[in-house]
Amino acid sequence: KQLVMCYEFIDDVFEGYYYFYGEDEDFDEQVWADYGYNVVDYVFWHEVGHAFIDIYELPITGLEEDVADQFAALMLSYTYDSETGSYTLGQTMLYDVGTWYYNENLYWSEIYPAETGEEYVPLYWDVHSLDIQRFYNITCYAYGSDPEYNQHLVNTEDLPEDRAIDCEYEYFMIEYGWEYLLGGVDNGFFD
């Protein structure tokens, strides 16, 4: 078994960011590169989550895509920044992933129809949650992992207060759930 990350996908991530921000006066190529890396890193961990579920035959409830999203968010939240001595790098990575989902939703729901004259119909039946739902979920997990650091997400209304109330518990349950599921697997993740 193997994980495959397609060059076309990676290219789409970078092109998508450039589509939204490439003409900005303060466009920063390093921010662009970091964004692309962070989204690709997230997708890698998302696929690792699928692999763990498959290889170790982990019992899950709910959509596997959501569970894999949760695993990826958890792994990013554990990213330690040795320069600052904190986990703020992981928070930035999660913000970039949230931005990616937000922009994907914006493109398909508003920009694509305006540019093509074709109506976009969300795939409500798909195994993936809608991009806008994934945006709010990722934002919630970021907030829940460190509410004090991420209070600005609520203050700027990127995360509604009604959702933020339960985010710390949601994050705890994700962390606890994955620790439990992988507890019998000698992988070193939760040692």
Roles of regions detected by a PLM:
Residues 1-41, 48, 52-60, 79-80:
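Peri-catalytic and regulatory segments of divalent metal-dependent proteins
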Residues 115-191:
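Pan-zinc metallopeptidase signature
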Residues 61-80:
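An active-site-proximal "capping" alpha-helix that borders the catalytic cofactor pocket
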Residues 22-28, 84-86, 113-117:
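Flexible coil/linker segments and helix-coil junctions enriched in charged and small residues
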